[in-house]
């Protein structure tokens, strides 16, 4: 029985609950471009469209003006769908081999999730990873203690992934949620925040644990306040374009947001 007006929280995976800094996908994108076409992209370029499904992500990287320029210089044309297919084909086995190495939960994530479960709040999740990558990640994350009630991968639904609301709404259906206004979507990337808005949910962006700050956990721990502030502001500038209801540093700060949304729902507010 729930003792909260919040029915469900839907979490992203990498950079939100596992894989501090969202390094599993970014490093693999760099490697996949190299392996598929002997073409160099840097980590910043690989991070730029994070949150999209991986095929769409590769397409978006190819459309970054600087990447498109270098691609044209090397191949005499812009990237085609066939090129994207080839890079995606290189990406998949690399990602499956590496994703388990980046399954460590982010600080306090398990405690926060278990606290939500104790309140009777359901835990949904969705990811920009395709199902065959999630099939590797889910059991490893479970060994660490992370067991969401439902998981949607970016290629599970024929309608597609983010920024459309379909993955979030699939969670709503499968978790038997009766009101999208009683749901919270938590993500470290803009497309996932947009997904939450499009699904009619409260949205929470993460500034320091995810893709936009791009810090390893070790860098985060060692950083002085000036370094953290610079990373925070870099992420804030990107995420504010999606107008999240809340911006917090990491999942460790989420319980205060939950308490505030509970108060607002009780007062009749809606997202």
Swiss-Prot record:
EC annotation from Swiss-Prot or TrEMBL: 3.11.1.1
Gene3D superfamilies associated with the record: HAD superfamily/HAD-like, Putative phosphatase, domain 2
Residues involved in Mg(2+) binding: 12, 14, 188
Cofactor binding description: Binds 1 Mg(2+) ion per subunit.
InterPro entries according to UniProt: HAD-like_hydrolase_sf (IPR050155), HAD-like_sf (IPR036412), HAD-SF_hydro_IA (IPR006439), HAD_sf (IPR023214), PGP-like_dom2 (IPR023198), Phosphonoacetald_hydro (IPR006323)
Catalytic residues in the record: 12, 54
GO cellular-component term (any): cytosol
TM region(s), chain numbering: none
UniProt entry tagged with the keyword Phosphoprotein: no
Alphabetic keyword roster: Hydrolase, Magnesium, Metal-binding, Schiff base
Gene Ontology process terms (BP): DNA repair; organic phosphonate catabolic process
Catalytic activity entry: phosphonoacetaldehyde + H2O = acetaldehyde + phosphate + H(+)
Cofactors demanded by this protein: Mg(2+)
MF annotations from Gene Ontology: magnesium ion binding; phosphoglycolate phosphatase activity; phosphonoacetaldehyde hydrolase activity
Function noted in UniProt: Involved in phosphonate degradation.
Protein family (similarity comment): Belongs to the HAD-like hydrolase superfamily. PhnX family.
Subunit field text: Homodimer.
Name of the protein: Phosphonoacetaldehyde hydrolase
Species this chain originates from: Vibrio campbellii (strain ATCC BAA-1116)
Gene, per the UniProt record: phnX
